[in-house]
Design a protein with these regions (language model features):
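A conserved structural/catalytic subdomain of Rossmann-like adenosyl-cofactor enzymes
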Residues: 12-244
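Conserved SAM-binding strand-loop segment of SAM-dependent methyltransferases
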Residues: 2-10
Length: 244
Protein backbone atom coordinates (compact mmCIF):
# COMPACT_ATOMS: atom_id res chain seq x y z
CA UNK A 1 0.00 0.00 0.00
CA UNK A 2 1.41 3.37 -1.00
CA UNK A 3 1.28 6.05 1.67
CA UNK A 4 2.38 9.57 2.49
CA UNK A 5 2.12 10.58 6.13
CA UNK A 6 3.64 14.00 5.51
CA UNK A 7 6.96 15.51 6.49
CA UNK A 8 6.23 15.52 10.22
CA UNK A 9 3.54 14.69 12.77
CA UNK A 10 1.41 17.81 12.94
CA UNK A 11 -2.07 19.23 13.43
CA UNK A 12 -3.80 18.63 10.10
CA UNK A 13 -5.82 21.84 10.45
CA UNK A 14 -3.07 24.32 11.32
CA UNK A 15 -0.11 22.57 9.65
CA UNK A 16 -1.67 20.72 6.74
CA UNK A 17 0.81 18.08 5.56
CA UNK A 18 -0.89 17.61 2.18
CA UNK A 19 -1.89 21.09 0.99
CA UNK A 20 -1.99 20.21 -2.71
CA UNK A 21 -3.51 16.72 -2.38
CA UNK A 22 -6.70 16.19 -4.40
CA UNK A 23 -7.75 12.59 -3.84
CA UNK A 24 -10.08 10.28 -5.74
CA UNK A 25 -11.19 8.58 -2.52
CA UNK A 26 -10.94 9.52 1.16
CA UNK A 27 -11.90 7.33 4.14
CA UNK A 28 -11.75 8.91 7.58
CA UNK A 29 -12.75 8.23 11.17
CA UNK A 30 -11.82 11.51 12.89
CA UNK A 31 -12.32 12.01 16.64
CA UNK A 32 -15.91 12.94 17.49
CA UNK A 33 -16.89 16.39 18.73
CA UNK A 34 -13.39 17.61 19.65
CA UNK A 35 -13.57 21.05 21.23
CA UNK A 36 -9.92 22.16 21.41
CA UNK A 37 -9.08 22.21 17.71
CA UNK A 38 -9.43 25.89 16.83
CA UNK A 39 -6.58 28.34 16.21
CA UNK A 40 -6.87 31.96 15.19
CA UNK A 41 -4.96 31.30 11.98
CA UNK A 42 -7.92 29.23 10.72
CA UNK A 43 -10.23 32.23 10.45
CA UNK A 44 -11.35 32.51 6.82
CA UNK A 45 -9.39 29.40 5.77
CA UNK A 46 -10.09 28.48 2.11
CA UNK A 47 -11.17 25.02 3.25
CA UNK A 48 -14.26 26.52 4.86
CA UNK A 49 -16.10 26.86 1.56
CA UNK A 50 -19.50 26.32 3.16
CA UNK A 51 -18.96 28.39 6.30
CA UNK A 52 -16.60 28.80 9.25
CA UNK A 53 -16.91 25.75 11.56
CA UNK A 54 -17.77 26.45 15.20
CA UNK A 55 -14.68 26.90 17.33
CA UNK A 56 -16.00 24.47 19.96
CA UNK A 57 -16.63 21.47 17.69
CA UNK A 58 -14.51 20.17 14.79
CA UNK A 59 -17.12 17.95 13.10
CA UNK A 60 -17.85 20.38 10.28
CA UNK A 61 -14.19 21.27 10.01
CA UNK A 62 -13.46 17.61 9.25
CA UNK A 63 -16.23 17.41 6.64
CA UNK A 64 -15.01 20.52 4.83
CA UNK A 65 -11.36 19.52 5.16
CA UNK A 66 -12.12 16.22 3.39
CA UNK A 67 -14.17 17.94 0.69
CA UNK A 68 -11.34 20.40 0.08
CA UNK A 69 -8.93 17.54 -0.56
CA UNK A 70 -11.15 15.69 -3.06
CA UNK A 71 -10.37 15.75 -6.76
CA UNK A 72 -12.97 16.92 -9.30
CA UNK A 73 -14.74 13.53 -9.24
CA UNK A 74 -13.60 12.44 -5.78
CA UNK A 75 -15.67 10.74 -3.08
CA UNK A 76 -15.26 10.63 0.70
CA UNK A 77 -16.64 8.37 3.43
CA UNK A 78 -16.48 9.80 6.95
CA UNK A 79 -17.55 8.40 10.33
CA UNK A 80 -18.95 11.05 12.66
CA UNK A 81 -21.18 11.33 15.72
CA UNK A 82 -24.92 11.17 15.08
CA UNK A 83 -25.34 14.73 16.28
CA UNK A 84 -23.58 15.99 13.17
CA UNK A 85 -26.66 15.08 11.11
CA UNK A 86 -28.98 17.48 12.89
CA UNK A 87 -27.02 19.95 15.03
CA UNK A 88 -27.81 23.61 14.48
CA UNK A 89 -25.45 25.06 17.07
CA UNK A 90 -22.93 27.75 16.17
CA UNK A 91 -23.35 27.77 12.39
CA UNK A 92 -23.43 23.98 11.93
CA UNK A 93 -26.97 24.08 10.55
CA UNK A 94 -26.00 26.76 8.01
CA UNK A 95 -22.94 24.80 6.90
CA UNK A 96 -24.96 21.61 6.51
CA UNK A 97 -27.61 23.49 4.50
CA UNK A 98 -24.95 24.94 2.20
CA UNK A 99 -23.44 21.49 1.65
CA UNK A 100 -26.82 19.94 0.86
CA UNK A 101 -27.78 22.77 -1.49
CA UNK A 102 -24.41 22.43 -3.24
CA UNK A 103 -25.27 18.74 -3.81
CA UNK A 104 -22.07 17.37 -2.28
CA UNK A 105 -23.88 15.08 0.22
CA UNK A 106 -24.47 11.73 -1.48
CA UNK A 107 -25.43 9.12 1.14
CA UNK A 108 -26.25 9.26 4.87
CA UNK A 109 -26.24 6.08 6.97
CA UNK A 110 -27.32 5.84 10.61
CA UNK A 111 -25.38 3.05 12.36
CA UNK A 112 -26.36 0.80 15.27
CA UNK A 113 -25.28 1.86 18.73
CA UNK A 114 -22.41 0.26 20.67
CA UNK A 115 -20.20 -0.40 17.64
CA UNK A 116 -17.10 1.18 19.20
CA UNK A 117 -15.13 0.04 22.23
CA UNK A 118 -13.99 3.51 23.25
CA UNK A 119 -17.25 5.48 23.05
CA UNK A 120 -20.97 4.94 23.48
CA UNK A 121 -21.74 7.92 21.22
CA UNK A 122 -23.98 6.73 18.34
CA UNK A 123 -22.30 7.16 14.96
CA UNK A 124 -23.22 7.71 11.34
CA UNK A 125 -21.59 7.61 7.92
CA UNK A 126 -21.37 10.60 5.60
CA UNK A 127 -20.67 9.89 1.93
CA UNK A 128 -19.64 13.04 0.09
CA UNK A 129 -19.09 13.55 -3.64
CA UNK A 130 -17.41 16.52 -5.29
CA UNK A 131 -19.53 15.94 -8.38
CA UNK A 132 -22.28 13.33 -8.44
CA UNK A 133 -22.29 11.15 -11.53
CA UNK A 134 -25.66 9.59 -10.71
CA UNK A 135 -28.82 10.97 -9.13
CA UNK A 136 -27.84 14.63 -8.85
CA UNK A 137 -30.27 16.54 -6.68
CA UNK A 138 -30.97 13.52 -4.45
CA UNK A 139 -29.56 12.03 -1.24
CA UNK A 140 -29.80 8.35 -0.28
CA UNK A 141 -30.78 7.75 3.35
CA UNK A 142 -30.18 4.36 4.99
CA UNK A 143 -31.33 3.60 8.53
CA UNK A 144 -29.19 0.72 9.80
CA UNK A 145 -29.74 1.37 13.51
CA UNK A 146 -31.62 -1.90 14.03
CA UNK A 147 -29.30 -4.03 11.91
CA UNK A 148 -26.54 -4.56 14.48
CA UNK A 149 -25.94 -7.87 16.24
CA UNK A 150 -24.88 -7.91 19.88
CA UNK A 151 -21.71 -9.97 20.35
CA UNK A 152 -21.42 -9.16 24.05
CA UNK A 153 -23.38 -7.28 26.68
CA UNK A 154 -21.74 -4.01 25.63
CA UNK A 155 -20.60 -4.56 22.04
CA UNK A 156 -22.46 -4.75 18.73
CA UNK A 157 -21.26 -5.50 15.22
CA UNK A 158 -22.43 -5.31 11.64
CA UNK A 159 -22.24 -8.77 10.09
CA UNK A 160 -20.73 -9.29 6.65
CA UNK A 161 -24.23 -9.99 5.37
CA UNK A 162 -25.53 -6.62 6.58
CA UNK A 163 -22.47 -4.80 5.25
CA UNK A 164 -23.01 -6.45 1.87
CA UNK A 165 -26.68 -5.43 1.95
CA UNK A 166 -25.82 -1.79 2.63
CA UNK A 167 -23.09 -1.78 -0.02
CA UNK A 168 -25.47 -3.33 -2.57
CA UNK A 169 -28.11 -0.71 -1.77
CA UNK A 170 -25.67 2.14 -2.37
CA UNK A 171 -24.36 0.53 -5.57
CA UNK A 172 -27.88 0.03 -6.91
CA UNK A 173 -28.82 3.62 -6.07
CA UNK A 174 -25.76 4.84 -7.97
CA UNK A 175 -26.75 2.69 -10.93
CA UNK A 176 -23.63 0.55 -10.63
CA UNK A 177 -25.30 -2.83 -10.06
CA UNK A 178 -28.85 -4.06 -9.67
CA UNK A 179 -32.11 -2.14 -9.46
CA UNK A 180 -32.76 0.32 -6.66
CA UNK A 181 -36.09 0.67 -4.85
CA UNK A 182 -37.03 2.55 -1.69
CA UNK A 183 -37.69 0.22 1.27
CA UNK A 184 -39.83 1.63 4.11
CA UNK A 185 -37.92 1.66 7.37
CA UNK A 186 -34.59 0.99 5.66
CA UNK A 187 -33.76 3.26 2.71
CA UNK A 188 -35.16 6.09 0.63
CA UNK A 189 -33.88 8.45 -2.05
CA UNK A 190 -34.91 12.02 -1.23
CA UNK A 191 -34.88 15.18 -3.34
CA UNK A 192 -32.98 18.20 -2.04
CA UNK A 193 -36.16 20.26 -1.90
CA UNK A 194 -37.70 17.83 0.60
CA UNK A 195 -34.54 17.92 2.72
CA UNK A 196 -34.68 21.72 2.72
CA UNK A 197 -38.29 21.46 3.90
CA UNK A 198 -37.03 19.53 6.93
CA UNK A 199 -34.53 22.24 7.83
CA UNK A 200 -31.67 20.34 6.13
CA UNK A 201 -31.68 17.73 8.89
CA UNK A 202 -29.96 14.59 7.57
CA UNK A 203 -31.15 11.97 10.07
CA UNK A 204 -32.24 8.91 8.01
CA UNK A 205 -35.09 8.02 10.36
CA UNK A 206 -36.82 11.24 9.40
CA UNK A 207 -37.07 10.18 5.76
CA UNK A 208 -37.23 6.39 5.47
CA UNK A 209 -40.48 6.03 7.40
CA UNK A 210 -41.59 2.97 9.33
CA UNK A 211 -41.01 -0.59 8.27
CA UNK A 212 -44.07 -2.20 6.74
CA UNK A 213 -45.70 -4.73 9.04
CA UNK A 214 -48.12 -7.48 8.20
CA UNK A 215 -51.66 -6.60 9.13
CA UNK A 216 -54.05 -8.88 10.92
CA UNK A 217 -57.79 -9.27 10.91
CA UNK A 218 -58.28 -9.11 14.66
CA UNK A 219 -60.75 -6.38 15.58
CA UNK A 220 -59.39 -3.52 17.67
CA UNK A 221 -61.81 -4.21 20.54
CA UNK A 222 -60.74 -7.86 20.70
CA UNK A 223 -57.07 -6.94 20.54
CA UNK A 224 -57.48 -4.35 23.30
CA UNK A 225 -59.32 -6.86 25.50
CA UNK A 226 -56.57 -9.43 25.00
CA UNK A 227 -53.82 -6.94 25.80
CA UNK A 228 -55.68 -5.74 28.90
CA UNK A 229 -55.99 -9.31 30.16
CA UNK A 230 -52.28 -9.94 29.60
CA UNK A 231 -51.42 -6.72 31.41
CA UNK A 232 -53.58 -7.77 34.36
CA UNK A 233 -51.82 -11.12 34.50
CA UNK A 234 -48.39 -9.46 34.50
CA UNK A 235 -49.42 -7.03 37.25
CA UNK A 236 -50.68 -9.92 39.37
CA UNK A 237 -47.44 -11.83 38.87
CA UNK A 238 -45.45 -8.74 39.82
CA UNK A 239 -47.47 -8.29 43.01
CA UNK A 240 -46.95 -11.95 43.91
CA UNK A 241 -43.20 -11.63 43.44
CA UNK A 242 -43.11 -8.46 45.54
CA UNK A 243 -44.85 -10.33 48.35
CA UNK A 244 -42.17 -13.04 48.53
Amino acid sequence: IDFNLGKEPADTFTRNQHPVLRADFILANPPFNISDWWHGSLEGDPRWLYGDPPQGNANYAWLQHMLHHLGPSGRAGIVLANGSMSSSQNNEGQIRAAMVDADVVEVMIALPGQLFFNTQIPACLWFLAKKKTARPGEVLFIDARKLGRMISRVQAELTDEIIDRIAATVAAWRGEAGDYADQPGYCRSVALAEIAGHGHVLTPGRYVGAEAVEGDDEAFADKMRSLTEKLGEQVAKGAALDAL
